[in-house]
């Protein structure tokens, strides 16, 4: 959530910056509500002052033995008007809050202005795409003989679900464990296990609600009269970040660096017809997430660090990738600045997103009331960051395509072999011993 003081001081400036990311801020509606709020507050202050004055007058009159009934009646009328004003003020505050919950974060000044992903800016590349001396297959054709089972996934759960069997399942597990070990042993993150089902207020905290309810899977528990609605997490960013909601941490505890491996559940509303083949876009997929909670002055250094942590995974796996700065029109709702990592997929002859690292500044913290005690001992909002480290399924796709061999086998990346019991190659059934 944006700082309401920023909106009050520079409404037109905020509107312009939000327009850069395609959000039309209703300046007239906000201004009208603010004007009404100020008028009610001013009137309430006048009534309070008048009531205080009359209360003193009543005391003096009683001391002189005078009749106070008329003044008492006026005080009663003031009280009734103040109660009505309080109700009206609550209504206006609720409407302001509703309006502000719909507003995305203001882009950082360094974010390139653009309409959509076509105007993102490439920052750097790492690794050269492998030159194959045979016809490259996509991950579906490579993986199906090795244990990718889309047919059974569809039979069990419908489209965009996959069953992994045998060596493919083991490789998938190895990737997740390798990522967690790298982040905890080399990058300073604390491994965390959190629930996969969360309450709605948690999703308000990180910005998925109210705007993106259609992207979430809802779950309900209880009888018809006592139904409680909860949601499956679309990323463990949600649960990890909310571990500091409604709290004040000491400055000495910062930065807090958390990582988790979890399934993620997304309805993929609005993605009909996109990436229908294979594992690129699934309703359920695994991801290793990185979250940092930091002091405000440290957040952009932390963003660069987090991007480096995601890059380290790809480099250890020797997968070519590029880093892209997202433009204003392509950033997520809560982000002030985002870098995407895109891995090379030879079958598509292009780079595809495998990680997104964002600094939300105080946007999520304000919604969660997540604070730290600053040098002056006063509570101050933290900054929160999140990043994929990495999407496990898409990393599996990249390994299958980049490490495929002409005979249908897949070479296991050196970094993963300790997690595969020393196995160096996954063989297709036709060449298995």
From Swiss-Prot:
GO cellular component terms, A-Z: cytoplasm
UniProt catalytic activity: tRNA(Ser) + L-serine + ATP = L-seryl-tRNA(Ser) + AMP + diphosphate + H(+); tRNA(Sec) + L-serine + ATP = L-seryl-tRNA(Sec) + AMP + diphosphate + H(+)
Protein location: Cytoplasm
InterPro entries in alphabetical order: aa-tRNA-synt_IIb (IPR002314), aa-tRNA-synth_II (IPR006195), aa-tRNA-synth_II/BPL/LPL (IPR045864), Ser-tRNA-ligase_type_1 (IPR002317), Ser-tRNA-synth_1_N (IPR015866), SerRS_1_N_sf (IPR042103), SerRS_core (IPR033729), tRNA-bd_arm (IPR010978)
Top EC class of this enzyme: ligase
Binding residues annotated for ATP, in chain numbering: 266-268, 353-356
Pathway terms, separated by semicolons: Aminoacyl-tRNA biosynthesis; selenocysteinyl-tRNA(Sec) biosynthesis; L-seryl-tRNA(Sec) from L-serine and tRNA(Sec): step 1/1
Binding-site residues for L-serine, renumbered to this chain: 235-237, 289, 388
Stated role: Catalyzes the attachment of serine to tRNA(Ser). Is also able to aminoacylate tRNA(Sec) with serine, to form the misacylated tRNA L-seryl-tRNA(Sec), which will be further converted into selenocysteinyl-tRNA(Sec).
Protein name: Serine--tRNA ligase
Organism phylogeny: Bacteria, Pseudomonadati, Pseudomonadota, Betaproteobacteria, Burkholderiales
Gene from which the chain derives: serS
